[in-house]
Amino acid sequence: MKFLADLEQLLVERRQNMPEGSYTTKLFQSGPQKILQKVGEETIEYILDAQNADKQKAVYEGADLIYHFMVSLVAQGWSLSDIIAELEKRHKPKGGG
């Protein structure tokens, strides 16, 4: 998880500084709709490789998917901790019998 936190911090810095020549900068400059389109494309690529049980390609596309998903979060001003908090909320033991 530390790596994902570090990656998120790098993405936040890229959004603030917009270094020239950075792929991430180009994504942020393209706007939220284009970023979300890229998330969709990477999702489809991951699904196709996973359905074909091609682990190497699925892992590669999964990494692309996570990266672009995180870019979409940062572009919206959201964070990975928002997603983690929701997952934790869903997995808390339910009260009662």
Where do the model's predicted regions map?
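Flexible "arm" and connector segments at domain edges
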Residues: 1-62, 66-97
